[in-house]
UniProtKB/Swiss-Prot annotation:
The gene is rplE. One of its GO terms (biological process) is translation. Part of the 50S ribosomal subunit; part of the 5S rRNA/L5/L18/L25 subcomplex. Contacts the 5S rRNA and the P site tRNA. Forms a bridge to the 30S subunit in the 70S ribosome. Pfam families: Ribosomal_L5, Ribosomal_L5_C. NCBIfam families: PRK00010.1. Belongs to the universal ribosomal protein uL5 family. This is Large ribosomal subunit protein uL5. Keywords: Ribonucleoprotein, Ribosomal protein, RNA-binding, rRNA-binding, tRNA-binding. This is one of the proteins that bind and probably mediate the attachment of the 5S RNA into the large ribosomal subunit, where it forms part of the central protuberance. In the 70S ribosome it contacts protein S13 of the 30S subunit (bridge B1b), connecting the 2 subunits; this bridge is implicated in subunit movement. Contacts the P site tRNA; the 5S rRNA and some of its associated proteins might help stabilize positioning of ribosome-bound tRNAs.
């Protein structure tokens, strides 16, 4: 819990004032904040094997500290042997304390464990949000490498209140995300 308090305190004490002066906001309410982190795994192979969803839910719950939910298909697709309302993925939405705990764990522990890690791409969605693709779930310390049956990747989306990509980049950079290179203007 001390990490969460320190990360929130760091945002209030250091990050928010730095962003306020960098972008010349007139009010502190204009400073972008991290609203939520959404972690998603698409598991197309779950059509053939239902146990994959259960394993993925348990792994995602262990990684995030919050119960994961299965995502279901919206329509039938015969070519993929997919029927409506079949589970085809797993997702978790983190807010408040758990969001900060996960961010801390991601930046300080998980990302440095990636093989040949040189930083993450700095491509945003145009509205200040950022999605990071992870190839292997084994970078998280909660996952026992010996007990996994298959390597699964995931998408981690950082939803911010930033209005531009530049503001979102500055916010996430201040939180400690290791981007590859400085943003080119």
């Amino acid at each position: 819990m001390s990490n969460t308090a320190s990360l929130k305190k760091e945002y209030a004490d250091r990050i928010a004032p730095a962003l306020k002066s960098q972008f010349q906001y007139s009010s502190t309410m204009q400073v972008p904040v991290l609203k939520k982190i959404v972690i998603n795994q698409g598991l197309g192979m779950a059509v053939a094997d239902k146990k994959i969803i259960e394993v993925a839910i348990n792994e995602m719950t262990a990684i995030t500290g919050q119960k994961a939910v299965a995502t279901i298909s919206r329509k039938d697709i015969a070519n993929f042997k997919l029927r409506k309302k079949m589970p085809i993925g797993v997702m978790v939405t983190l807010r408040r304390e758990r969001m900060y705990e996960f961010l801390e764990k991601l930046v300080r522990v998980a990302l440095p464990r990636i093989r040949d890690f040189k930083g993450i791409e700095s491509k945003f969605d145009g509205k200040g949000n950022y999605t990071l693709g992870i190839q292997e779930q084994i970078i998280f310390p909660e996952i026992n490498i010996d007990s996994i049956t298959r390597i699964l990747g995931m998408n981690i989306t950082f939803v911010t209140s930033a209005e531009t990509d530049e503001e979102g980049y500055a916010l996430l950079k201040e939180f400690g995300l290791p981007f590859k290179n400085a943003k080119k203007d």
